Amino acid sequence: TVGLISGTVSLKVAKLAGTQSVNVRSDAAAMGVRGTQFTVTSPPTGDILVTCDEGEVICTDDEGRELAAIPGTVVEKRPGELFRTVPVAVSSLETFRKNWNAERIDALRANALRAIRSFAALYATLSREFNANYAELMKKQAILSKWQEEDRRGKLGSAMEIMREKKDIVRHLFALRRTLFQFERVYFRLVELKVYHDQGYGRGTIAAGETTTQFFQKLESEKKDVMKKMAVIRYVTKLYALRNDGRVPTGLSDEEQEDDGDFFGD
């Protein structure tokens, strides 16, 4: 699975065997493919464009609705709207992608202040949740330090130790990863919006008298702490997966975790 926060990802997937699959996941949709050459584009506006040169891409939104992108038909999704198909000749795909992305960026510049206000409000809420969940995980420092030392030595604890440690940490790690999925997307969209803000777009007041300039200064001052915490969460997730047959926490108890996501992939 490839996580797409913003930008463009192009993949050519050869024939896959068995249960293998390739997926691209954004904050609002998932694209599943087999034997396909395709491109997924997502500008800072949150729009999604899926174009397919060959094969087929199944696009699934966050409510489970599906739509297929095939040669001659692209799929797009705008924030708050459903997927829709648009007919486009395969020979014109590259030009269509460039024009589509340029239109989205022009729209963003025209409505930059509204976008900044929206993402700033989400950031404030998710940041509080993220930091609170992180603090809860850090209360398990004895386990985290033990895992880090075992990782340094290239060893694992006994089966009984691992079972006990996973049980103590699984719910905290699951809650944190669930928040992180949303938080990092909001954070990096704001980082992109700052580029346009620095060019003079979207300047104004956000809320309670705070200006956009003050907000981005605060965002920059928090950057080091945010990036460190994100890195720690990914490292702890890796250490957990090493003790759980390569599977990441789903929020279930250790005894129930039979269908966790595979951290290492196929």
Predicted regions span which residues?
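Long, low-complexity or tandemly repetitive, helically biased scaffold regions used
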Residues: 111-266
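Flexible, surface-exposed loop/linker segments and immediately adjacent secondary-structure boundaries
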Residues: 1-75, 79-156
